[in-house]
């Protein structure tokens, strides 16, 4: 096993109806005005956006909203979010969605407090400062809810780059497996596949004697093998979705990758 450091300070609230406490967590982590960032209409149609707004209002927290995040989040919406945050005096970014929404939120959070072009961070500049970010996860897949990573597509050339830094690691993440029960089977299956890919990326290593992380990865892979078909057969199976959601976080917060290369 190689030397390593491990830092994973995200606060997690896991379980049914936990999104109703979003306002409490925003205030706990220093937010006074919030950007609610989300993707498509499902967040609106399901009533989730209204519940999030109500939670913020209960805490007396003003907010602005910015929807429209697409898969492989685009730089154009990040610039729009940065401008909105600066104009409105936003000091906390709340992502409501999956990995693309969370990655876009992280980019907005970093860009808002930076004098230059946020794309500098996706060209190698270290991220040392950002607005705090919180998440409400709606699909178990990317693992961005517990990681310091973000990937954005630059629309000037349509290429993707990543950035990473503890400043953009979510301060809190709300994980309610019930929010994933309305996902189509295809998206659910893609999420399971994404989680397994993250695990294989860490499992395949030349580092010897990493028994703890070997066994941890194997346990998570077995969980995916067991729970994936189960949740496709019964999309309302809360327990299967709960296991998948927590495994997705563990697969990408690097607890499985320490001490190995």
Describe each model-derived feature in a short phrase.
Residues 1-92:
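ATP/NTP phosphate-donor binding region
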Residues 11, 33-35, 63-64, 91-94, ...:
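Structural motif
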Residues 51-52, 80-82, 101-114, 146-149:
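Short Gly/Thr/Asp-enriched flexible loops that form oxyanion-binding sites at enzyme active sites
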Residues 70, 96-98, 259-261:
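Active-site nucleophile and cofactor-binding loops and adjacent substrate-binding regions
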Residues 90-108, 138-144:
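Glycine/serine-rich anion-binding loops at beta->alpha junctions
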Residues 113-209:
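A glycine/threonine-rich phosphate-anchoring loop and its flanking beta-alpha core
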Residues 202, 206-261:
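Active-site segments that bind and position negatively charged phosphate/pyrophosphate groups
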């Amino acid at each position: 096993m190689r030397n390593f450091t491990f830092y994973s300070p995200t606060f997690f609230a896991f379980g049914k109806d936990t999104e109703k406490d979003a306002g409490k967590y925003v205030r706990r982590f220093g937010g006074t005005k919030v950007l609610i960032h989300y993707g498509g209409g499902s967040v609106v149609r399901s009533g989730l956006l209204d519940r999030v707004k109500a939670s913020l209002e209960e805490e007396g927290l003003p907010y602005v909203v910015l929807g429209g995040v697409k898969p492989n989040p685009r730089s154009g919406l990040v610039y729009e979010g940065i401008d909105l945050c600066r104009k409105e005096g936003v000091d906390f970014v709340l992502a409501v969605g999956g990995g693309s929404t969370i990655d876009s939120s992280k980019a907005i959070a970093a860009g808002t407090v930076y004098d230059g072009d946020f794309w500098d961070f996706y060209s190698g500049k270290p991220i040392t400062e950002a607005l705090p970010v919180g998440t409400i996860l709606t699909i178990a897949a990317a693992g961005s809810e517990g990681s310091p990573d973000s990937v954005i597509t630059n629309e000037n050339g349509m290429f993707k780059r990543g950035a990473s830094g503890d400043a953009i690691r979510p301060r809190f993440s709300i994980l309610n497996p019930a929010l994933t029960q309305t996902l189509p089977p295809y998206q659910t299956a893609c999420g399971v596949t994404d989680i397994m890919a993250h695990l294989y990326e860490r499992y395949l290593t030349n580092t010897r004697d990493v028994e703890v992380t070997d066994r941890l990865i194997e346990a998570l892979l077995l969980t995916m093998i067991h729970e994936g078909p189960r949740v496709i057969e019964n999309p309302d199976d809360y327990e299967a979705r709960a296991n998948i959601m927590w495994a997705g976080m563990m697969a990408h917060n690097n607890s499985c990758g320490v001490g190995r290369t």
